């Protein structure tokens, strides 16, 4: 069940927002604390503005007037707030009313609860924290459930992967109806996974005022993450990194899971502790993971087995689980290689073998590129502005250059320019130079392309960098970084689908 949080300043604007999204939502939460004016009669009638709803039935509405101290927008007299809640609920149009945990302890909400009982409105008993999880969430759920018929609600902002794990465990171990959701980047997965965690409902929003709290719009929830199809048997896949919310991977993998008929979902998880993530992966029974910066190296000690691509490159970008545990590979290697090999087979009779290539850059991204090239018998020259780094990476990868040569030089110097000219069948750019927002930069502005070079830039934002544009203008065939992303993601998708079949069997 998916509820949209409404935070517009007028009742009519909120009704319009709700009606625009009736295709994707099951109900709404009216955040009356965001209203510029709160006339009691109009507030009480608000649910009637949404009739009829989906399937010609009424739209369930939660009435919430959140105090400033709980992360809301209401700063007025507490007695006035409670009277507003009492009178609006007493009209009998709201399906739920949200009341904070402290009100039941003091008994100050007795009149609101009495009005709710008479009108058939269910009470949601809530706890909110923007400063971590606020202690033992399991115990708090028990306290929030103390009054019969009330639905406990926990909305917190986890500040770490460990706190997300605490939230997930609390929801999975709870019994009965509950709403346990996280806010912010660390809490985002709990929004999507609410049905998997056994929650009664989750929240979404299109209003920027609720960006931190609700996190994602209704259409994305339903069309990308297929929220309404998720259940406690759904397989959970993830991409981990820090930061992670910019990742393109959910938009790539989720449609492919749907096309394959998989009861699976792929979510971004912000990870500050790899150890905590693997505890979370065990709790959620995660069969496959995409790994991005800064965790490609730090995940390796947690894996049962790694293949040569991980050993050579020193980084793992894909994890899958089998009967014996998690295994790691690096699909960046073949993801980079596939579009290049396709072009090479059409240009040269022997394909890549025996060609001469220059790799610009000696950072982490270059290692997968260098390893892929020398594995295919390409003679490689590594150029970097810090010469010692170019030398180090070539020495580390030289044991894998079984049928190829591997040399190095200083980028921008005469010697380096000479090496570049002698290794110009293929030129691969692996640095961040030219990446958004630095789009006017070029890693080798002094080099004059001749038109015979096959030029590859692994940067995919922008799709065509200044480096690639200059090469294309000189008649060179170019390969965009987006092709590498697509290639490695496709390989990941195959591995994830295999892991899903193994899990299902």
Where are these regions (language model features)?
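Active-site beta->alpha loop and helix N-cap motifs at the rims of alpha/beta catalytic domains
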Residues: 2-118, 122-134
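NAD(P)-binding Rossmann-fold cofactor-contacting core
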Residues: 378-400
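Catalytic alpha/beta core domains of metabolic enzymes, predominantly
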Residues: 102-233
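Glycine-rich adenosine-cofactor-binding loop
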Residues: 182, 237-243, 330-333, 340, ...
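Rossmann-like adenosine-cofactor binding region
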Residues: 402-478, 483
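Active-site capping/gating segments
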Residues: 338, 342, 460-461, 476-503
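Short, conserved loop/helix-junction motifs that constitute active-site signature segments
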Residues: 54-56, 117, 352, 444-453
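Phosphate/diphosphate ligand-binding glycine-rich loop within oxidoreductases
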Residues: 234-348
């Amino acid at each position: 069940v998916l509820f949209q949080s409404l935070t517009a300043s007028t009742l009519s604007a909120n009704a319009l927002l709700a009606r625009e999204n009736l295709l994707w939502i099951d109900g709404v939460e009216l955040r009356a604390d965001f209203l510029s004016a709160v006339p009691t009669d109009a507030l009480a009638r608000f649910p009637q503005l949404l009739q009829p709803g989906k399937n010609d039935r009424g739209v369930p509405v939660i009435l919430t007037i959140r105090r400033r101290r709980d992360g809301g927008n209401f700063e007025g007299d507490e007695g006035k707030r409670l009277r507003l809640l009492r009178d609006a609920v007493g009209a009998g149009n709201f399906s739920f009313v949200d009341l904070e945990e402290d009100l039941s302890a003091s008994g100050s909400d007795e009149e609101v609860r009495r009005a709710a009982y008479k009108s058939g409105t269910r009470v949601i008993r809530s706890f909110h924290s923007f400063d971590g999880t606020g202690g033992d969430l399991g115990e708090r759920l028990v306290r929030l459930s103390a009054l019969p018929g009330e639905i406990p609600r926990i909305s917190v902002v986890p500040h770490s992967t460990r706190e997300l794990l605490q939230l997930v465990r609390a929801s999975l171990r709870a019994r009965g109806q509950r709403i346990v959701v996280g806010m912010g980047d660390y809490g985002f997965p709990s929004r999507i996974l609410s049905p998997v965690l056994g929650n009664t409902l989750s929240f979404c929003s299109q209003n920027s005022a609720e960006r931190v709290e609700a996190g994602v719009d209704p259409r994305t929830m339903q069309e990308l993450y297929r929220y309404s199809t998720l259940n406690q048997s759904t397989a959970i896949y993830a991409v981990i990194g820090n930061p992670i919310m910019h990742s393109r991977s959910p938009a790539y993998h989720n449609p492919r899971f749907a096309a394959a008929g998989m009861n699976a979902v792929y979510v971004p998880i912000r990870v500050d502790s790899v150890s905590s993530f693997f505890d979370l992966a065990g709790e959620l029974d995660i069969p496959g993971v995409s790994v991005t910066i800064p965790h490609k190296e730090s995940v390796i000690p947690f894996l049962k087995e790694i293949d040569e691509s991980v050993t050579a490159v020193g980084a793992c970008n894909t994890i899958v689980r089998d009967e014996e545990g998690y295994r790691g590979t690096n699909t960046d290697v073949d993801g980079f290689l596939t579009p290049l090999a396709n072009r090479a087979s059409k240009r040269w009779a022997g394909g890549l073998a025996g060609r001469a290539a220059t790799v610009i850059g000696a950072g982490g991204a270059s290692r997968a590129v260098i390893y892929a090239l020398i594995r295919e018998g390409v003679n490689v020259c590594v150029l970097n502005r810090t010469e010692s780094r170019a030398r180090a990476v070539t020495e580390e990868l030289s044991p894998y250059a079984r049928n190829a040569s591997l040399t190095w030089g200083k980028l921008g110097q005469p010697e380096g320019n000479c090496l570049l000219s002698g290794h110009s069948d293929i030129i691969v750019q692996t640095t961040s130079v030219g990446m958004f927002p630095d789009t006017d930069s070029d890693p080798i502005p002094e080099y004059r392309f001749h038109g015979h070079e096959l030029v590859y830039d692994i940067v995919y934002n922008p799709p065509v960098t200044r480096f690639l544009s200059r090469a294309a203008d000189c008649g060179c065939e170019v390969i965009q970084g987006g092709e590498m992303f697509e290639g490695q993601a496709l390989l990941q998708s195959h591995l994830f689908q295999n892991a899903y079949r193994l899990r299902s069997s």
